[in-house]
Amino acid sequence: MNTFSQVWVFSDTPSRLPELMNGAQALANQINTFVLNDADGAQAIQLGANHVWKLNGKPNDRMIEDYAGVIADTIRQHGADGLVLLPNTRRGKLLAAKLGYRLNAAVSNDASTVSVQDGKATVKHMVYGGLAIGEERIATPYAVLTISSGTFDVAQPDASRTGETHTVEWQAPAVAITRTATQARQSNSVDLDKARLVVSVGRGIGSKENIALAEQLCKAIGAELACSRPVAENEKWMEHERYVGISNLMLKPELYLAVGISGQIQHMVGANASQTIFAINKDKNAPIFQYADYGIVGDAVKILPALTAALAR
């Protein structure tokens, strides 16, 4: 048996749902999707869900992962085994841990490949900071996986599809985290997972002000702007949501233009699936050139304006 009888899908990030649903279609005979509202439920059915389970009644001061109890109860009530697919977001991983405990299931995070043989999941994911690929065969009846972005293709909606909708009512957990306040994040983030062209800057750009040069290039060629982890986490020059690497974004654009990025393995794990990699770095020995299809050795601050002018013609 090369599929599970049932798969259970939930995504706290709506943009990740089409990819998870495509994976579900390949891995199971029946697809169950947990959603937070009617609109997401309608989308899930168009993407292939046979059954939609609307999570209902969570107080505003409680976290999404507090649904773990009723989600696990629902899963157990409908089969003695099954596969659970979640996105590898922060909330997704927190929910995965809670479900793993309640289902007595093995949990595997950041899966980049998933297959099924004899009713058991085999999962591959990065280990040792991206230096190697680890493979795990999950032996527990239930398997809970968080899926890296780009693992599956995106499912296409079909308005002719039909499915059944059910309601799952909130049950307060015995121990819960209560949200006491929220603060809006200042962010101009975009969905980089869908970008065809990406210009990504590293600390070699020199300063926060010089990022404007990369932004001008993005406007000229219709690209989206990303960065390396040090730019976001250490220098605080850009938003956390834009950094590429093993612990955040895993991209597969047609073009990845790396500007002032050294090319350490932790970063390249998030970019080396790009169709074409173009590197600009003043260090001719930078590791990025080992991955690049094309490269320019030189000062990015001088090269970017010239490149922008040439491509804008």
From Swiss-Prot:
Cross-referenced InterPro entries, in alphabetical order? DHS-like_NAD/FAD-binding_dom (IPR029035), ETF_a/b_N (IPR014730), ETF_a/FixB (IPR001308), ETF_asu_C (IPR014731), ETF_asu_C_CS (IPR018206), FixB (IPR023461), Rossmann-like_a/b/a_fold (IPR014729)
Keyword Flavoprotein included in the entry's annotation: yes
Residues that, per the record, bind FAD: 255-283
One Pfam family per UniProt: ETF
Any one Gene Ontology BP term? fatty acid beta-oxidation using acyl-CoA dehydrogenase
> Is DNA-binding one of the keywords UniProt gives this record?
no
Cysteine disulfide partners in this protein: none
Q: How does it assemble?
A: Heterodimer of FixA and FixB.
Q: Which NCBIfam families match?
A: PRK03363.1 (NF002889)
Family annotation (HAMAP family): FixB
The protein's job, in short, is: Required for anaerobic carnitine reduction. May bring reductant to CaiA.
Q: What is this protein called?
A: Protein FixB
What is the organism of origin for this protein? Escherichia coli O6:K15:H31 (strain 536 / UPEC)
Q: Which gene encodes it?
A: fixB
